[in-house]
Amino acid sequence: MTEVLMFDALREATDEEMQNDSSVFILGEDVGHYGGSYKVTKDLHSKYGDLRVLDTPIAENSFMGMAIGAAITGLRPIVEGMNMSFLLLAFNQISNNAGMLRYTSGGNFQIPIVIRGPGGVGRQLGAEHSQRLEAYFQAIPGLKIVACSTPYNAKGLLKSAIRDNNPVIFFEHVLLYNLKDELPNDEYFLPLDKAELVRDGLDVTILTYSRMRHHVMQAVVDLVNDGYNPEVIDLISLKPLDITSIAQSLMKTHKLIIVEECMKTGGIGAEIIAQINDNYFDFLDAPIVRLSSQDIPTPYNGKLEKATVIYPQQIIEAVKSIV
């Protein structure tokens, strides 16, 4: 086992897959000589050169189209968004081309592309650079969506995403790049469609993902000290949702809390509630509690920015309100 920071875990995954398969390449703003805005591509340019580590202009729609075209020809591009919010400028390419071409071509085209980069609230990046786009992409047919939360799952998921023959949106959080974890020395992969049982429990199921996993686990320490026994599941796969794992937990605890950094209106939590109400409503002993970010642009001011997202005390209060 080796202790690794998250940005290094992502870099290792990329490096290993580029060594394994010459069709894998990465492109994006400052991914080459600079090594990426959060150093995920550090030293890869010197190792693989301009043809496989491409610095692009500030033209997201153009280089996304370039990557999709490369994928159609059999290459495996990794697109790094310097900030995931910038990918709104490539929304047409992601939706109408990456997401739909395999279907609209009758299966003649595969689009093995990974679109990854930093997002989420933190570092006082302002409203335009703090967007949570997972709900935007969730509505697009043909996409897979994952959100990493630890160095361990970041590496295993990214390696699986690169080898997948479908477009994968890969969310990383700006505040988790310096998170440390122990990684196996042997190669490993993690499934793109499975949730992770983080903590077994009986009283209530808490669903979460990305940065909020760590806020939930901070809350769990106090909850356990107060005699509560929550079950915690990291969704990881935001599309498709691992509804089977969610349902199995709900059948045991009969209470559900969703903790997300996504906006409440039309967010990931809203989709989970819809699916639970459609298929597993009879297993609920209490209304589902949803803790989400406020439906406002993220303020630049640090105190106001912090006030828009969920913190451990709110999670503790939510558990005590239904258990």
Swiss-Prot record:
Cofactor: thiamine diphosphate
Keywords: Chloroplast, Metal-binding, Oxidoreductase, Plastid, Potassium, Pyruvate, Thiamine pyrophosphate
One Gene Ontology cellular component: chloroplast
Protein name: Pyruvate dehydrogenase E1 component subunit beta
The organism of origin for this protein: Gracilaria tenuistipitata var. liui
SUPFAM superfamilies, A to Z: Thiamin diphosphate-binding fold (THDP-binding) (SSF52518), TK C-terminal domain-like (SSF52922)
UniProt subcellular location: Plastid, Chloroplast
Complex and partners: Heterodimer of an alpha and a beta chain.
EC number, UniProt record: 1.2.4.1
InterPro entries on file: THDP-binding, Transketo_C/PFOR_II, Transketolase-like_Pyr-bd, Transketolase_C
GO molecular function: metal ion binding; pyruvate dehydrogenase (acetyl-transferring) activity
Record's function text: The pyruvate dehydrogenase complex catalyzes the overall conversion of pyruvate to acetyl-CoA and CO(2). It contains multiple copies of three enzymatic components: pyruvate dehydrogenase (E1), dihydrolipoamide acetyltransferase (E2) and lipoamide dehydrogenase (E3).
